[in-house]
């Protein structure tokens, strides 16, 4: 399902972020896609208005998932330099690693949307 179908559930800030996310995906900006995917999820989780239609058990299940933890770790590795990380070695394979990670981040974001906004 397209992320556009969930636009109506998002607050104005997240709508702007989702538009930027879509542009980054279309333009193969893999790092930006990874960072924005978690930013959008974090904004959903911190928006108290979402409590009206998101089940607390769904939130708990999602934030304790392996995928969510992977996304947070990967985003933090990108933003907070603590030595060389895979995907940043300026080789042809590095771009492929970031692309694969970006596709995984996209899958996690779509999973978040489908679980929260049923």
Feature-to-residue mapping (PLM):
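Long, hydrophobic, amphipathic alpha-helical segments used as structural scaffolds
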Residues: 29, 40, 48-52, 82-86, ...
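Charged alpha-helical initiation segments
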Residues: 1-29
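Short, hydrophobic, well-ordered secondary-structure elements
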Residues: 22, 27-48
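Short, charged amphipathic alpha-helical segments flanked by flexible coils
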Residues: 46-77
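Non-transmembrane, amphipathic alpha-helical segments
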Residues: 6, 25-29, 60-63, 94-97, ...
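A short, mixed-charge helix-start or loop-turn motif at secondary-structure junctions
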Residues: 2-4, 57, 91
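Amphipathic, well-ordered alpha-helical segments in soluble domains
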Residues: 13-17, 36, 74
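Charge-enriched, short contiguous segments at helix-coil
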Residues: 70, 74-118
């Amino acid at each position: 399902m397209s992320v556009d179908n969930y636009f109506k559930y998002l607050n104005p800030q997240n709508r702007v972020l989702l538009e930027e996310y879509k542009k980054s995906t279309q333009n193969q900006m893999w790092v930006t896609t990874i960072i924005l995917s978690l930013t959008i999820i974090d904004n959903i989780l911190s928006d108290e208005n979402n409590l009206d239609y998101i089940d607390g058990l769904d939130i708990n299940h999602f934030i304790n998932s392996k995928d969510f933890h992977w996304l947070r770790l990967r985003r933090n590795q990108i933003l907070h330099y603590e030595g060389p990380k895979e995907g940043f070695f300026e080789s042809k394979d590095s771009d492929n690693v970031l692309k694969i990670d970006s596709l995984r981040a996209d899958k996690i974001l779509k999973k978040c949307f489908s679980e929260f906004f049923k």
